């Protein structure tokens, strides 16, 4: 499965580009979390990962727009994958990171049993801390049965809109059955009964994290960077660049990919595409000076796809044995490949 990650694209924009995306050889589109989030007026790239609850509708589109997108995508032979943020909610800012924001839905905010301990992770190599404590945000206890009902009601609503798959944000921070948490067992059953699939990001390379990754693979595909090994390669979803590696630059992320050129990305992705069954290509923002969104007017991608670029793309990704022998096109294929 070849997935294109359309971070911060409005649903109506995606709908207009479906035919071109299909021509590029993709099987599925991954879109933003559809949950409401704080700070829409002062949008940052991470804003949609601080949700206010489990319902559909935000600046990228409402429930009806999601239904239309799914219907149109299916007409073009494309699956729709929605990013879901279940591990945490929006907080009260840096000075009060572990308490939910006042705009978080009352059914969550007012129920004390829904929340993890109000403390942060100190040892990121300690699996218990990473799954039981907060990650700079108010953590939700996904082992709570009442909370699970709310979450699965939301996932069912996504399915009813036509969604095919789910990308579980912060999956490595959600406990597994070996931790005494049954959430992903229920997720597996839900997806089986609803003919859906899902994947969750699991990072870390030591023995403890490899064990966590291998257990996760019993329930979801494992989303992990190039170089990760897994016994069942069909359970691996591989990427080289993600929104985190491109947008989250600074001392906390020395391995960012901002310096990669368009040629680097074309070459790397063409290789991954031939090496792995399941791959994701992240589309960078259109304006490198405004990396938080595609433009001021609504995250559009005007005139990105042109016929000669589509032909170039297909030749590079599908046919060329050596991408380095092909000259860089005058007009780049995807926004941000500067």
Q: In which residue ranges do the predicted regions lie?
A:
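A residue-level signal for beta-strand positions that form part of recognition/binding surfaces
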Residues: 1-3, 236-237
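Active-site-proximal helices and loops of the catalytic beta/alpha 8
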Residues: 16-22, 33-35, 40-46, 68-82, ...
């Amino acid at each position: 499965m070849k997935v294109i990650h359309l971070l911060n694209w409005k649903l109506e924009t995606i709908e207009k580009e479906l035919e071109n995306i299909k021509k590029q050889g993709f099987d599925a589109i991954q879109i933003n979390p559809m949950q409401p989030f704080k700070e829409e007026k002062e949008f940052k790239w991470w804003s949609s990962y601080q949700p206010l609850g489990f319902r559909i509708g935000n600046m990228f589109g409402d429930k009806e727009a999601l239904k239309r997108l799914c219907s149109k995508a299916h007409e073009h032979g494309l699956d729709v994958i929605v990013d879901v943020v279940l591990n945490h909610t929006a907080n009260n800012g840096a000075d009060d990171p572990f308490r939910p924001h006042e705009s978080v839905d009352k059914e969550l905010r007012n129920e004390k049993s829904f929340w993890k301990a109000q403390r942060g992770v100190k040892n990121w190599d300690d699996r218990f801390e990473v799954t039981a404590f907060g990650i700079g945000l108010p953590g939700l206890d996904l082992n709570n049965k009442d909370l699970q009902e709310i979450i699965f009601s939301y996932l069912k609503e996504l399915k009813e809109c036509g969604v095919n798959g789910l990308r579980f944000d912060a999956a490595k921070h959600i406990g597994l059955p070996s931790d005494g948490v049954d959430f992903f067992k229920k997720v597996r059953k839900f997806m089986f009964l609803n003919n859906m699939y899902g994947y969750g990001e699991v990072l870390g390379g030591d023995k403890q994290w490899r064990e966590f990754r291998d257990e996760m693979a019993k329930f979801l595909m494992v989303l992990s960077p190039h170089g990760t090994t897994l016994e069942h390669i069909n359970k691996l979803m591989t990427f080289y660049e993600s929104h985190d590696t491109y947008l989250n630059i600074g001392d906390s992320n020395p391995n960012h990919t901002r310096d990669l050129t368009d040629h680097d990305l074309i070459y790397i992705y063409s290789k991954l595409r031939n090496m792995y069954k399941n791959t994701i290509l992240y589309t960078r923002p259109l304006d490198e000076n405004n990396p938080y969104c595609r433009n001021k007017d609504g995250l559009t991608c005007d005139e990105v796809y042109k016929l000669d670029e589509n032909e170039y793309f297909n030749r590079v990704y599908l046919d060329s044995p050596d991408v380095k022998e092909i000259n860089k096109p005058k007009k780049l294929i995807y926004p941000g490949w500067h």
